[in-house]
């Protein structure tokens, strides 16, 4: 199973927290000390906590669970999308729309509209419209694709959230808490770990650190999914005898 070592984390700068004046005292158990007014995260804590989170995500994936990757900060946006797509999962990487989980019924209608517009753009409907109308629909399609493209094929609520930056994505975490969906999150020294089921204390800004987390999660999810596919193949093989 995918695991991450202390050396990998040091190389990626996972241990660098935020400036000491911005800290959240709830993160004290995970802080090693401070250097040049910047908190240093205790990787002796992070390594086992991250590997425990990976093992749990592996289990969820092996049971056909759907994992929603959430990271809407500009620096992490593309990496979040790439990681989710690389393991056939789902993502929100631009803006978290309030109610995305708690008001799923409305979101589902917007997804239906997105899919209708996609069909229209491909089957020649747009070409039959006036220029103005076609432009309006193209803009609507782009807007919907931007906000819902990563969840349009999710087909219902996710079974887990993997979040980059618990502070930035607090609305998503709150919605998941309300629905009892487990939250796995990177929690930096300025963030509140409450509401996160699997806390991963670490730097949530450095792109190398973010890429490290996402790569490991995507790998463990792929592995979990292949176990699920292997067991399905075994079952069908037994039935065929």
Curated annotation (Swiss-Prot):
Tree of life domain: Bacteria
Protein name: Small ribosomal subunit protein uS2
Family: Belongs to the universal ribosomal protein uS2 family.
Keywords on record: Ribonucleoprotein, Ribosomal protein
CDD domains reported in the protein's UniProt record: RPS2
GO molecular function: structural constituent of ribosome
Gene: rpsB
GO BP: translation
NCBIfam families: rpsB_bact
Record-linked InterPro entries: Ribosomal_uS2 (IPR001865), Ribosomal_uS2_bac/mit/plastid (IPR005706), Ribosomal_uS2_CS (IPR018130), Ribosomal_uS2_flav_dom_sf (IPR023591)
GO cellular component: cytosolic small ribosomal subunit
């Amino acid at each position: 199973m995918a695991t991450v070592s202390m050396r990998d984390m040091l190389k990626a700068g996972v241990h660098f927290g935020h400036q000491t004046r911005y800290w959240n005292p709830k993160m004290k158990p995970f802080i090693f000390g401070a250097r040049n007014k910047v908190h240093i995260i205790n990787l002796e804590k992070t390594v086992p906590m991250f590997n425990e989170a990976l093992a749990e995500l592996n289990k969820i994936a092996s049971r056909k669970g759907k994992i929603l990757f959430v990271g809407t900060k500009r620096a992490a946006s593309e990496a979040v999308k790439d990681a989710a797509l690389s393991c056939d999962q789902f993502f929100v990487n631009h803006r978290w729309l309030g109610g995305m989980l708690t008001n799923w019924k409305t979101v589902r209608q917007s997804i239906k509209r997105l899919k209708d517009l996609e069909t229209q753009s491909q089957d020649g409907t747009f070409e039959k419209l006036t220029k103005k109308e076609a432009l309006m629909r193209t803009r609507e399609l782009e807007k919907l694709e931007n906000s819902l493209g990563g969840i349009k094929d999710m087909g219902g609520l996710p079974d887990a959230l993997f979040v980059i930056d618990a502070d930035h994505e607090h609305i998503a975490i709150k919605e998941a808490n309300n629905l009892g969906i487990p939250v796995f999150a990177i929690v930096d020294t300025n963030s509140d770990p409450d509401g996160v089921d699997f806390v991963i204390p670490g730097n949530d800004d450095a792109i190398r650190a973010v890429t490290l987390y996402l790569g490991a999660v995507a790998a463990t999810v792929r592995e979990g999914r292949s176990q699920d596919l292997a067991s399905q193949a075994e079952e069908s093989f037994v039935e065929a005898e």
